[in-house]
Amino acid sequence: MASLKRFQTLVPLDHKQGTLFEIIGEPKLPKWFHVECLEDPKRLYVEPRLLEIMFGKDGEHIPHLESMLHTLIHVNVWGPERRAEIWIFGPPPFRRDVDRMLTDLAHYCRMKLMEIEALEAGVERRRMAAHKAATQPAPVKVREAAPRPASVKVPETATQPAPVKVREAAPQPAPVQEVREAAPQQASVQEEVREAATEQAPVQEVREAATEQAPVQEVSEAATEQAPVQEVNEAATEQASVQAVREAATRPAPGKVRKAATQPAPVQVCQEATQLAPVKVREAATQPASGKVREAATQLAPVKVRKAATQLAPVKVHEAATQPAPGKVSDAATQSASVQVREAATQLSPVEATDTSQLAQVKADEAFAQHTSGEAHQVANGQSPIEVCETATGQHSLDVSRALSQKCPEVFEWETQSCLDGSYVIVQPPRDAWESFIIL
């Protein structure tokens, strides 16, 4: 079987069969070669790819090795899949040494080939990695970085904040309509309050509003006709019960004076700064009382005049505050009108009178109680000083004073003095009555 490839050698040989070889042609044999060396050669099997590494291309290094080692080296390649066969001819000790040397050389070349292959593979991998890095990573990263921020973040910032904020900002000014609607409502409420302030109070509120005009017919009938004791008691107690009158007597004013002293009246805040009590005292100071108030002021009121003489007249608060009443000078100096809260804030209220003045009033009540009936005395003591003042100037004081003056005219004769315009009346008790109070 012929070899696929022949390598260079000093002595060309042809394999006959078994271990029989013959020299081809008539070559020049080296001096160290003997024909007996062709028997029983040494064989070595290696990979065909190692032959070129071991002996060079086409075995160009084999003649040099043969001359140096004094052995013949014959290489036969039977196929690329099969192993190459190396025959070693020479003396037996040389054959063993050359066989060991070629085995080590084959191992070294094998390792060298593996390193070369590994280096080539590494270079190839790096080349492929560099090629991939140059071709694939750039477009992949650009595609991932470009579409994601553009398609995800930009649409959210472009579409979501704009409609949400605009839609929320659009309906927010809607409460302005409510404010505009509330403004005319507040104006209508103020107009109603103004109308309510200008309208006249009903007849039932005559006791509190001394400025309103009462029917002339009732005043004339009350001034001409004599009322029995029961009607007098009912008229005196008609305003409130005895317990309510006693509670009202301990309070400075029928309303909440403390709140009225610090807060404006609920009718008109602007007008409250210039007006007095909610009853319109200024108009009452200039206008005459209802009906026949002037005549009633000049008539005798033996039951309740003793308290009215000691307190300030509710009609003229400014003038009465400076002029003491002849009946009770000490009490009039210490007490103030409960109707006008702001001007009388520095003066003492009727409730804060001294114990001495209260004791004198109680004794005076007991002295007058001997001349009047028990019921009239109880009614006079049950009412508060504010109600006595209102009763002395209002329409009900006409009935009470008229009835009591007709029933017991022999008690005392009082002296009255009225101003030119008839806006207020000064009632002076006689000297005898004043001395009787001092004795008590």
Swiss-Prot record:
Claim: Cytoplasm is one of the keywords in the record: yes
Main location: cytoplasm
Residues carrying Phosphothreonine: T274, T286
Site (Not required for interaction with OOEP): S151
Keyword hit for Isomerase: no
GO terms, biological process: actin filament organization; establishment of organelle localization; mitotic spindle assembly; mitotic spindle assembly checkpoint signaling; negative regulation of apoptotic process; positive regulation of dendrite development; positive regulation of double-strand break repair; positive regulation of double-strand break repair via homologous recombination
Location of the region described as Required for interaction with NUMA1 and regulation of apoptosis in response to DNA damage in the Swiss-Prot/TrEMBL record: 341-440
Gene3D superfamilies: K Homology domain, type 1 (3.30.1370.10)
InterPro entries listed in its UniProt record: KH_dom_type_1_sf (IPR036612), KHDC1 (IPR051778), MOEP19_KH-like (IPR031952)
Limits of the KH domain: 40-118
Superkingdom, taxonomy of origin: Eukaryota
Modification sites for Phosphoserine: S151, S349
Gene ablation phenotype (knockout): Reduced fecundity and impaired preimplantation embryo development with a high incidence of aneuploidy due to abnormal spindle assembly, chromosomal misalignment and spindle assembly checkpoint inactivation. Loss of cytoplasmic lattices and aberrant organelle distribution in oocytes. Increase in abnormal embryonic structure and loss of the embryo following compromised post-implantation embryo development. Knockout mice show normal brain structure and weight. Increased DNA double-strand breaks in hippocampus neural stem cells at P1 to 1 year of age.
Quaternary state and interactors: Component of the subcortical maternal complex (SCMC), at least composed of NLRP5, KHDC3, OOEP, and TLE6. Within the complex, interacts with NLRP5, OOEP and TLE6. The SCMC may facilitate translocation of its components between the nuclear and cytoplasmic compartments. Forms a scaffold complex with OOEP/FLOPED, and interacts with BLM and TRIM25 at DNA replication forks. Interacts with PARP1; the interaction is increased following the formation of DNA double-strand breaks. Interacts (via C-terminus) with NUMA1.
Domain remark in the UniProt entry: Contains 1 atypical KH domain, which is still capable of binding RNA.
Function of the molecule: Component of the subcortical maternal complex (SCMC), a multiprotein complex that plays a key role in early embryonic development. The SCMC complex is a structural constituent of cytoplasmic lattices, which consist in fibrous structures found in the cytoplasm of oocytes and preimplantation embryos. They are required to store maternal proteins critical for embryonic development, such as proteins that control epigenetic reprogramming of the preimplantation embryo, and prevent their degradation or activation.
Protein name per its UniProtKB record: KH domain-containing protein 3
Originating organism: Mus musculus (Mouse)
Gene name as annotated: Khdc3
